[in-house]
Amino acid sequence: MKRENEHKEYCEQDILDQISRMSEDTEVPDSLRSENIDKLLEKKKQKKHFRPYQIGLVAAACVAVVAGTVVWQYGRMHEGAINSPDVSGGNAGSSAGNSNTVKKISDSKKIRTAQSYDEIYKYIKRSQDNSGIAMYARSVNETAAVEDSASTGRSTASSTETASADTGVATADGSYSQTNVRQSGVDEGDIAKTDGTYLYVREDNDRTIDIVDVGNSGTNIEKYSEITLGKEYTIQEFYVNTDQKKLVAVCQKECADKSNKKQTNTDTWNQTKTAAVTYDIRDIKKPVKEGEVTQSGTYNSSRMADGYLYLFSEYYTGGDMVKDKPVTYVPLVNGKEMSQASICLPPVNCGTMYEVISSVDISKPDKTVDNKAILSEGGQMYVSGKNIYYYESEWQQDNQTVTTLRKISYRKGKLKAVAQGKVKGYLNDTFSLDEYKGNLRLFTTNDDENLVTILDKKLDKISSIENLAKGESIYSARFMKEAGYFVTYEQVDPLFSVDLSNPEKPKILGKLKIPGFSEYLHFYGEDKLLGIGMSTDEESGVSEGVKITMFDITDRADVKEESTLVLDDLYGTNAAYDYKSVLADQQKNRIGFSGYSQNGETYCLLTYNGKEKKFETILKEEINGNTSQGIRGIYIEDTLYVISGNIIEAYDMDTGKKKGDIIL
């Protein structure tokens, strides 16, 4: 880990040194001169709550506008592609290609696919000519790979679909928890899973998945078998498909060094790949590798639905492109260049990277079913039960932001470009948009206002509500069927409830003002909404600890804060940026998450007493070990397994009493 961090820091400093030299003669726009940036930061300090990473984004954006798109994309990649309103009203990275030019966004509703490799080359070259430092894109790719290898499995998506279904499942053989996913019916990879009998855990070395027998309800935990990949692999996440008895490891895969003369030409241009490696686990003692697929770029995210894996990676183009060698600027899937017809061109006239999408039938795991690549300048995605929405924020004049969307349908592995569109404002995260009955509902922030927008299946605007919560910004959101909820925070902190039953006439039903704010929302049955966030002093804005809230949403026009629990010894949780870390099961009536205290990380397990309208603490235990992977709480029957890297600890879910543990 230390060596990886040193390498990352060296690469970052090298890139910054090059930027400094190349930007010495670059004229800086007035809005980004130091005195104006100081004013911007001072303005932010005066607000009651300012997310710490936003200051970093302001600085990163300044560098990007002076030096070019590539470095901003580097910053976006390591910040989880968070769109910030604090630089020119939106995602500075999207406007960095030419600091004095606002890019024209196409009004076409049709996604254009490339007619030739030459056309693709021109799009990328245009961006690189604007950026002035495209030669460092290759370094960005390689450095990103090192950092991703050292990080936890990404969610990425970040946060990010309708759902909030319980994180548990009941079968004839018993009950057990499942990964907390964004969209009901669409599975996501994780670093720990269970099939109700065994635990599957990625070790800290990121190359091994242990299969663990929990023994007598956690009193006799034993390692049963393992799957270990080669040193060129870094396991990001994995899936366990109980129907087909398959385990699929989604990995980052590093190619041989460029100096290796035996290396192929395609490997030279694609140093980092994303791989899906599938194992047959019918004999749990002896898993058998069945197949592998690869695609260009660093791992971004993945989904699994109906036995098909959908793999997403980010491939950044290098500055050493050769026009008549598409391999130097076109992604590869299973070692072959993607066809030009599979590449979706952006709604603006330039692009610096691809979101590469491949589908795999896990019953035939050595080949892909279909693939697409979305040429862009960096964005995020939301995956519904039928469609993939890829969105980017584009800076416009007068601190305005426009979010562009591209819609790709998926069904049984087949991918189809459907439509593109745009809306005012930027999205806080992927919980801020949702597909329902063919329509797409979005909550966005644009400069100092917030909006509700509804688009039809062709991404044409049906309706919108504007000028909401002036001077505030959206912190969290959630949709359930014909209703939506979002929390804003700035000087006041309301929870808005929205009636979406008539797509042509959405209505704001209520606005509940509450102290503090919820950074993560999760439906707890049909009439309750769970919020995990922070309690703050209403006058000073100083944090007073982690706040757990249960909202009564029985009457959407009169939402009530039914109960609140403040954990004043915790100063934050993982819920806001890693929703997979949350256990929320209304059927089991258990809420689990990890938080941070002065002594390290603490795992909390709560239950909610609906009759007395209060939270009750079952477990609040300091987590052993020191892992960078993230903490997971998984239950089988009535035993909770808290997993921290190579350490598993078992607790009784009713009493909180420890039952056993193991170090893998």
Give the location of each predicted region.
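Disordered, charged N-terminal biogenesis/targeting segments of membrane/secreted proteins
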Residues: 1-49
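Bacterial N-terminal signal peptides that target proteins for export
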Residues: 49-55
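N-terminal non-cleavable signal-anchor helices
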Residues: 17, 59-67, 88, 147
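Single-pass transmembrane signal-anchor helices and their membrane-water interface zones
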Residues: 33-44, 55-82
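Beta-sheet-rich non-transmembrane sensory/scaffold domains
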Residues: 33-37, 77-664
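Generic secretory/membrane-interface signal
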Residues: 8, 56-58, 67, 465, ...
